[in-house]
């Protein structure tokens, strides 16, 4: 639990200075490292009742990453504002399911070579309808560059 508090403190400060890519990368790493927790939480809680509070903390940290990414994207004109209050918070609360489901599928299919790039593609697939023209142009321009960065940054995970 202390590790989560340290991660949150460090991330909160560093988010102020990070690029959108670094925020996304760190969130994917975070979700990857704690995905078993999301997937197996009901069984874990039966064995360790205190795990519920840790789950809440992990989930809140994931939400903070996502909301920060979205807020920076809106501020920079890459994403549209919410169509209704709380729209992006719903996505932020549940994006772990995309990562967990995707990783499990690719691990079963033994497609580990491209799994992180595919996670980026799936996450962006959910964001894409909410991008502004400026955001779509930026995404199309940077997609290959980001895919290469992901391949490099995640090769040792």
Task: Give residue ranges: language-model regions.
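Hydrophobic/aromatic residues within well-ordered alpha-helical segments
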Residues: 1, 23, 27, 34, ...
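Hydrophobic alpha-helical connector segments
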Residues: 7-37
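Secondary-structure edge/capping motif, primarily at the C-terminal ends of alpha-helices
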Residues: 7-12, 38-45, 77, 102-110
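Helix-loop "lid/cap" segments that line or gate small-molecule binding pockets
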Residues: 25-32, 41-46, 125-131
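Internal, conserved structured core segments that host functional sites
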Residues: 32-33, 37-41, 46, 54-61
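Short, hydrophobic secondary-structure boundary micro-motifs
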Residues: 39-42, 54, 81-82, 108, ...
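Amphipathic alpha-helical packing segments from all-alpha helical-bundle domains
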Residues: 50-76, 87-104, 124-129
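C-terminal peripheral helix-coil segments that are non-catalytic and often amphipathic
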Residues: 104, 108-157
